[in-house]
Amino acid sequence: MSRVLLRGIQCHACRSNVIRSFISVSDVAITPLAGGSRSTAQARPPPLSRNFSSQHAKLFSNQPSDNAELVVDPIPEIHTGEETEGQPEESQEHIPWYLKEEQVEETIPHPLRKQQPLPPLPENPPPILENLLEHISVDIGLDNLSLLDLRRLDPPPALGANLIMIFGTARGVKHLNVSADRLCRWLRTTYKLRPDADGLLGRNELKIKLRRKARRAKLAKSAKSTLTQPDDGITTGWICVDVGTVEGGQFRKPEEELRKVGFVGFGTVVEGTRIVVQMMTEEKRQEIDLEGLWRQKLERNSLENEGLPQPQAAAPQEAGDIHEQLTVPPTNISHQISHATQISANYEQRRGISTGSRRYQDATSDTWGTSQISPNSETTHLEPSAPSSLTSLSHHFKNIPPHEAIYDLGQGTHDRCSTAFLQQFYQEVARAPSELASSRRIELMCIAIELHHPGYRKPDLFQAIQEHVLSNYALTRAQFLQILDAFLSFKPDLTSNPPRLLLPNADMELALQIIDHAGLRGLNLLDSTILVKLFVGVSFRAQVYPVKEKDLPNSPVIGNRIPVPLNTCDAVKRVQSRLTRVKTAAKITFTTEQYMRILRVLFDQGSYSEFWNTWEDMALAGIARDKALYVFLFQLHAESDGWQCFTTQLLNCIPMMERENPPVHLDGELAEVTQKCITIAYPEIIDRVERNEQNPLVRMWHRCRVAIENAAAAGGRGQDSTAPYVCNHSDI
């Protein structure tokens, strides 16, 4: 110890206490002073010396030393009362920093946590989840974090059972790639996991793509052009990081469901929880709305998996208010409840409850044409006539003119009582089972839209279909095709400027959404019927011919053909070409009627090359080109002009008719339309016939005239007017 320090302390007792306080650290005891020296310590030492000794012993001596009994400190015993009196003075004394007790400072939360709160943890979370959210929010810096617990989803998602999905927004494309890369590295080093990042480019791969993009941009700049490729494979804006299966947090199903009778499966039950992190840019997250789609799936699944209520006196209100509630006598209610089957809350038994509801309604109806049901009667003997009644009402429009059908349909979707038909229809709908009522209501709206009723709109039909689907009702193929026809139906407006000849984009979008939903339900979309409907739906609804945009105002109507912009016509042809390639790739075969619809569309828009290619494809596909098909061919050309450059192809079909299998002979009906086509292609044919020129065209005219005369003579004698005219091929 420094001598200067000891010299500064004049009191011997204080110097002894100072030395004792330092040496007590090494557990060395000091013998107390003799009695003679005790007298010198009668005076009270300075408070600093005592405080120094006591505080030092508290701070440094963790355990009592072995010689603690030999150490005697007489000063605290003598001056105990004085110390208690002098405590207020000690509190005012200056305390050095090394004598102050350390105070535990409150932990200050991270500033990013205030700006971006972490989503609450779900029930029974896996241990890694909290650290993962903390790392994603603070270290990586993703914003707007949200968490979806998909562990209760039944059936489980395609990513796997016991799934927890985390959504986060990156500040940009570069931040997105860096965040995904750092997250994968953190998971590998910290938890020894093997994450899979779908959409993440490796560092070398990203450098290569950026280098190639810069090279292409440089070449395009030197060529004075711009890069028009919309997707360069770099700026996807979406990376899905599959963390993998982690320990803990799995959802345990009740034992009753695990011991379900009749359940058959394979494989083993996967233990643990799978975590998936969806990283997206702000624009991509708003565009796809993946979080909203999963939330809808969760809400629908929670409704399906809830405990179903017991049968009650009043029928539950279905989605869309399709039918009204009925009041039933208590005897019938007790009878139905007593005969209801015991069911559990799953998908199949839910339809069982719906069946019970149908029987309950059928038994209480008085207008089905059945006798009054007694309380002791069996519900299995009921034969309701509601389906037949609704079916007859739906077929009512097939036997009346369109204007009468539009009148019977009333003012619109919400009109239910303005006409006698609507009153009867909705009375039957109120008594019918809910699923049948929903189907017939959709069918009625489809019929009205196909008739171009102004009060029935396609968005209302789409809403009715959504209610039908959310009610877990079936959607048959016939219903789907009828709905598709309604959305693709369109009445051209020739009076507008410019004329509206194409289906609006909004209607096509609704049709495509219905097609997507049908595909999710398992319906075959690579079908000739659907392909032809789409082919006709995207086409012009009148005969047109293309002109340049600048020449459109001065272009007249030629015959029946209306001028349309060249770029619009090219866009329609591109879509038709894609559908044709789909047909070829999927090896889809068309029927004769479907080929006729495609031929008419191609002829109306002036695609004559594609028209004759399709005509030849029919023969290659093995389609029998019979008389009806040839009449259709010549009738198309007889109704319009503009095809004169393809006259040779048309006239070559006449000798080809008798080479078909079976052969098609030239009769009166065929001869009439053939003469019309010859007249359009060669207006001077009458002069040539009068001059009796010797050429194939005149001989063909005479052959058609003879066939018409034979048909007229056969009709006058009461014989078949379609008797063929057979001639020698040398006459042609």
From Swiss-Prot:
Q: Which GO terms describe its biological process?
A: mitochondrial gene expression; mRNA stabilization
Which residues lie within the region annotated Disordered?
355-393
What membrane topology term does the record carry? Peripheral membrane protein
Where does this protein have compositionally biased stretches of type Polar residues? Answer: 355-379
- Protein location: Mitochondrion inner membrane
Instruction: Could you list this entry's UniProt keywords, alphabetically sorted.
Output: Membrane, Mitochondrion, Mitochondrion inner membrane, Transit peptide
Which GO cellular component terms are attached?
mitochondrial inner membrane
Q: Where is the transit peptide?
A: 1-52
The Swiss-Prot or TrEMBL record describes its family as follows: Belongs to the ATP25 family.
Q: Which PANTHER family match?
A: ATPASE SYNTHESIS PROTEIN 25, MITOCHONDRIAL (PTHR28087:SF1)
Q: What is the annotated role of this protein in its UniProt record?
A: Probable mitochondrial mRNA stabilization factor.
* Protein's name according to its UniProt entry: ATPase synthesis protein 25, mitochondrial
At the highest ranks, the source species' classification is: Eukaryota, Fungi, Dikarya, Ascomycota, Pezizomycotina
- Which gene is this protein's source? ATP25
